[in-house]
UniProtKB/Swiss-Prot annotation:
Keywords: Cell cycle, Cell division
Protein name: Cell division topological specificity factor
Source organism: Alteromonas mediterranea (strain DSM 17117 / CIP 110805 / LMG 28347 / Deep ecotype)
Gene3D superfamilies membership: Cell division topological specificity factor MinE (3.30.1070.10)
GO biological process: cell division; regulation of division septum assembly
Length: 86
């Protein structure tokens, strides 16, 4: 490896490599959707409605994720609450 090798610009990934990576992300996302229960989107909306009884939040401030392990399933709920000062 010479000095000139260090000065060369790094090559950008080819468009085929970028397309392949994007496709893999889409396929992984679709597979995850197939394994989640049918009731999860409805459950998320009901949780949002209950939270809105007490604070004003947007739909994108609530994240619901279901993780399946060998022995159990874990439902993770993340809510971004507004500042209490306002």
């Amino acid at each position: 490896m010479g000095i000139f090798d260090l000065l060369k610009k790094k090559q950008k990934p080819s468009t085929a490599a970028v397309a392949k990576e994007r496709l893999q992300i889409i396929v992984a996302h679709e597979r995850k959707k197939r394994t989640e229960p049918d009731y999860l989107p409805m459950m998320q909306q009901e949780i949002i409605q209950v939270i809105r009884k007490y604070v004003t939040i947007a739909d994108d401030q609530v994240s619901v994720q279901l993780d399946n392990n060998d022995e159990c399933s874990v439902l993770e709920l993340n809510v971004t609450l507004p500042d209490s000062n306002s």
